[in-house]
Design a protein with these regions (language model features):
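Glycan-recognition surfaces
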Residues: 39-76, 80, 118, 122-228
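C-terminal beta-strand-rich structural cap/linker in extracellular carbohydrate-active enzymes
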Residues: 320-343
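Aromatic- and carboxylate-lined catalytic core of secreted/periplasmic carbohydrate-active enzymes
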Residues: 207-262
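Conserved, mostly hydrophobic/aromatic
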Residues: 15, 137, 212, 281, ...
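Solvent-exposed beta-hairpin/edge-strand motifs
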Residues: 299-317
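Short, well-ordered coil/turn segments that N-cap beta-strands
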Residues: 18-20, 89-91, 131-135
């Protein structure tokens, strides 16, 4: 909203000169200004006419007021912004706070719509058509279903650099790993490497939490004015070829067990992904004050207990052979990623 059309185009051109594609963020079904008399962009309609009301009061969630996806002015607003994005040359968009569009209301502009999800479907179909098949679309805060309006959906909300942030993301993966079968990808969203006091073990865990979710991006300040250590950490931990090879698979790992988090909001420690020739196994230690010793039976990993397998830990490069079970020890606030050869 703060950029002119010229500034948006300048940003896109800058990305293209760097061999990158440009992405943008937008919220189609919310009014963060909460200004009833402000005109809906691209129209002469005041926002008070497009709000969703429940018992006569504006529907509010997370500090923003919900707007009606079925209202003609809201659809013109979608046209106004998506046309700007097309003209500038964007090819990726993250659409957020979509849940607002699915909120129940006293009524909708379309009298045939009687539920929030009906309204959401109508608005999302209109939005998808406005993108004209030229955007990669990722959803953030949104209903899980319907799932056919976006390529990917964020597995959790904002997370940063600490081991607790990795566990927060992995709480979403522990229970939502199967959503990579509803969306093309589960999206781990931005990963940060630099915060004061963050260890390299936490960096490894943070990158791994994104890689095993499906797709990920870096959120550090890598500008010339940004901290030097952020650039050093990103260069060190985002360039492991074997780790990035997992990310290119684009599939979510599933929990080895699926029932062992120690409390609400906690995550599984062990995740697995089986491929034709290899099995990847990941062990996280969320504790900051003690190592994690573990033993995983081959039968739990769909491996033959009668065989001996060669394995490589991908962060350290250590090679081992295992029979009947996978054993290891993860240092505090760290991770191990094993690549086990099946053949």
């Amino acid at each position: 909203d703060n950029f002119s059309d010229e500034q948006l185009k300048e940003f896109v051109d800058h990305c293209h000169r760097n061999g990158q594609k440009a992405g943008i963020y937008w919220v189609p079904f919310t009014d963060w200004f909460r200004d009833p008399e402000r005109k809906v962009e691209g129209t002469d309609t005041p926002y008070r006419e497009v709000y969703l009301y429940a018992n006569g009061k504006e529907q509010s969630l997370d500090g923003a007021w919900a707007i009606d996806p079925t209202h003609p002015a809201v659809k013109k607003r979608i046209d106004y912004f998506t046309e700007r994005f097309h003209r500038a040359g964007f090819e990726y968009i993250k659409i957020d706070f979509l849940t607002h569009g699915a909120m129940e209301a006293d009524s909708h502009a379309d009298p045939n719509v009687t539920t929030g999800i009906q309204a959401y479907n109508q608005g999302m179909k209109y939005l998808l058509d406005a993108f004209k098949g030229k955007f990669y679309i990722t959803q953030a805060i949104s209903p899980v279903f319907p799932s056919h309006y976006a390529h990917s959906r964020r597995i959790a909300c904002d997370a940063f650099a600490a081991i607790t942030d990795s566990e927060y993301t992995l709480n979403g993966l522990s229970y939502g790993w199967w959503l990579c079968n509803a969306y093309r990808f589960n999206d781990a969203d931005h990963l940060l490497m630099f915060r004061e006091g963050i260890t390299e073990g936490e960096n490894r865990a943070r990158v791994t939490s994104g890689v095993i979710t499906g797709i990920y991006m870096n959120g550090d300040d890598l500008t010339l004015a940004g901290p030097k250590v952020a650039k050093e950490r990103v260069k060190k931990f985002f360039t492991n070829a074997e780790i990035n090879r997992i990310a290119r698979i684009g599939r979510s790992f599933r929990p080895v067990y699926g029932y062992r988090p120690t409390a609400n909001g906690r995550a599984e420690n062990f995740f697995v992904l089986e491929q034709e020739q290899v099995v990847y196994v990941v062990a996280f230690n969320f504790a900051k004050d003690r190592p994690l010793e573990y033993t995983l039976a081959f039968s739990d990993l769909n491996l033959d207990p009668a065989r001996t397998y060669s394995a490589t830990e991908l962060w350290s490069g250590v090679n081992e052979e295992f029979t009947m079970e996978l054993k290891g020890q993860v240092p505090p606030a760290d991770v191990q990623v094993w690549k086990i050869k099946k053949l």
